[in-house]
Amino acid sequence: NSDEQFDDYGYMRF
């Protein structure tokens, strides 16, 4: 994903 979002664990997903 190109959007910066935090998953349920708190890691940034790009």
Curated annotation (Swiss-Prot):
Top-rank taxon, per record: Eukaryota
Keyword Nucleotide-binding (UniProt): no
Name of the protein in question: Sulfakinin-2
Post-translational modifications reported in the UniProt record: Occurs in two forms, Rhopr-SK-2 contains unmodified Met-12 and Ox-Rhopr-SK-2 has oxidation at Met-12.
Record flagged with keyword Acetylation: no
Residue positions, PTM Methionine sulfoxide: M12
Source organism phylogeny: Eukaryota, Metazoa, Ecdysozoa, Arthropoda, Hexapoda
Location relative to the cell: Secreted
GO cellular component, one term: extracellular region
Entry function: Myotropic peptide.
Residue positions, PTM Phenylalanine amide: F14
Keywords: Amidation, Neuropeptide, Oxidation, Secreted
A GO BP annotation: neuropeptide signaling pathway
Entry similarity comment: Belongs to the gastrin/cholecystokinin family.
